[in-house]
């Protein structure tokens, strides 16, 4: 019998979340962001649920090949562009759109011999300070690209660093508009947080939106808002079962380092899930879990293959009882948002999704 841990991908939730994006940005086309193997969900698994998107955005050519192998004939955007000159030929063959964010990429394109001109997104650095041309250098980059016979169409893009917080998007929008107001081409401005939080300010200004984490049911501005506040549904459940039981007396300790000390008599359950499965090792005592749909807590340190949970709130739990590490319990409708587990671990839901280990079996419902 296989180990009882399981990741379950909820396709109906993916479709629901995509529809939620369209409600928030009704006039925009949608790039469904499927980088990092669709945030750990698997490109092949999520494709049917997201195929009503107008395009897919991702990072590397292998992911693009996989989409084309699924018979996707629509737009695909390489969010970081091409890393080597030889990638440009494959972009042509696969019909990919790609980002231009530095002078070296323009140089590669200028030296490229092709019969199929490229569609590119020229990226402005409006304050994120990762990729893109500064506002002062953006127009010169656009002029040079526009003169290249290798370029068919130039669209414009930028990325908001603070759309999820109090700083907002005003400064970035002003910087972008000041430089691009008279330039032709479609715009893509909005990430997940901007789509949900700045609907009014961006209405009619972003021809394409780029939802990422919202498609996968996590709130981009947690804990200010939860996923349910935004009417998002969780798309991944990580579940397991109790494989061992212990009864503790006051003063007994649990796990490596004896970091948890029982204050009184209690029962604990040993769960088949550990950091080798992608569960964060730095989750502390108190991290929420569900046992048979009832909320309780993890106690002690996370081991490679096991965690231990407090069964005090679930006196009927025993061997084989279901444990929901995040997502939906199988019965009763109980939910444990991935964002709550991530906050306990000092990280974000994105990381937990992407970190689920290959040894964890995956089911699709």
Swiss-Prot record:
Catalytic residues (positions): 35 (proton acceptor), 256 (proton acceptor)
Gene3D superfamilies recorded: Alanine racemase, Lyase, Ornithine Decarboxylase, Chain A, domain 1
GO terms of biological process kind: D-alanine biosynthetic process
GO MF entries: alanine racemase activity; pyridoxal phosphate binding
Disulfide feature: none
Binding site for substrate: 130, 304
N6-(pyridoxal phosphate)lysine: residues carrying this PTM: 35
GO terms under cellular component: cytosol
EC numbers on record: 5.1.1.1
Swiss-Prot/TrEMBL keywords: Isomerase, Pyridoxal phosphate
Catalysed reactions listed for this entry: L-alanine = D-alanine
Cofactor section: pyridoxal 5'-phosphate
Pathway: Amino-acid biosynthesis; D-alanine biosynthesis; D-alanine from L-alanine: step 1/1
Domain of life: Bacteria
Record InterPro entries: Ala_racemase (IPR000821), Ala_racemase/Decarboxylase_C (IPR009006), Ala_racemase_C (IPR011079), Ala_racemase_N (IPR001608), Ala_racemase_pyridoxalP-BS (IPR020622), PLP-binding_barrel (IPR029066)
Pfam families the UniProt entry points to: Ala_racemase_C, Ala_racemase_N
Family: Belongs to the alanine racemase family.
The protein's role, per its UniProt record: Catalyzes the interconversion of L-alanine and D-alanine. May also act on other amino acids.
Name of this chain's protein: Alanine racemase
Encoding gene, per UniProt annotation: alr
